[in-house]
Amino acid sequence: MEMNGLGQIGILYPQFKKSEKWLQQALESLEEELDRQIYPDGFQYELTTNYHDVVINNYQRFIEVAYKFGKTIPDTLLEKLSRACELDIKLMMPDGKTPDLNDGCRRDVKGSYEVRKRIIPNDKRAKWITEGDETGKPEYTSAAMPWSGFAALRTGWGQDDTWALMDAAPFGRAHQHEDKLSVLLYTNGKFLLTEGGNYAYDESEMRNYVLSTRSHNTVRVDGQDQNRRKTYAWKEEDIKKKANLEWNFSEKWDYAKSAYDEGYGEDQDKAPVHERAIYFIAIKISRF
């Protein structure tokens, strides 16, 4: 956010002697932050669909101003930003929205790309999602995110397709829920498996509920929730670590597997290993 502001000041106020320096500093920092905050598979390190798009929006606002004033954006920055944008497509549900992950929300992917296609020239995914250009349709159907730890399973890209998501993610940088191995399932225009969603950032009973394991489709142990929050500390090198996610995708079926072994209960003293695997039929079934 700060570099978005600094970059725009450097562009909009050329009468200041340091305006060009401010612009260059912003460009350098913005590209560095993509390396620092974005996993190699494209997800921002808070692992929430809402704040992921907040980050993209800050780049978007800066780049739009830069283009209007004839400034050049480095190709390397645009390539990294494009990868972050495509993450929304990898996660996208049949209704065209992102799932509500951690302190996230369900955002319309096509609407987001209507703006993004103006800032990333020749983005083939943007042309597909906004204009229906089949040349930009993903060559994949299901998608695994090896670093951020999600597996999005789907029978196709249509509104009547079936979609599932397995959360095998690390705890993330912020806005986390205690939800590892949670599963979402959506078919025929509705959720069959959902979760507690989000709530105001307060200390209410409802806020505690949506953060907890019991508001997600994963197990508790002896009535106790997962508790990674107690001892978790983000390290800069975590952005390069792969999640403990296994997967195999084929034309007829998909498979995803992970495990949770980081403790349950207030003191993390309940320490069984919970393993979960999903077998997903990857062909359409009209009635079941």
Where are these regions (language model features)?
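Extended ligand-binding groove/face enriched in aromatic
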Residues: 1-4
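Short coil/turn linking the two alpha-helices of tandem helical-hairpin repeats
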Residues: 7, 11-14, 67
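Helix-rich, typically C-terminal accessory recognition domains appended to large enzymatic cores
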Residues: 16-19
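Short, charged, amphipathic alpha-helices and their helix-cap/turn boundaries
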Residues: 24-36
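Blade-edge beta-strand/turn elements of extracellular beta-propeller
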Residues: 34-39, 276-278
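Carbohydrate-active enzyme catalytic cores, enriched for enzymes
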Residues: 39, 43-192, 246-251
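Non-catalytic C-terminal accessory modules of carbohydrate-active enzymes
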Residues: 140-288
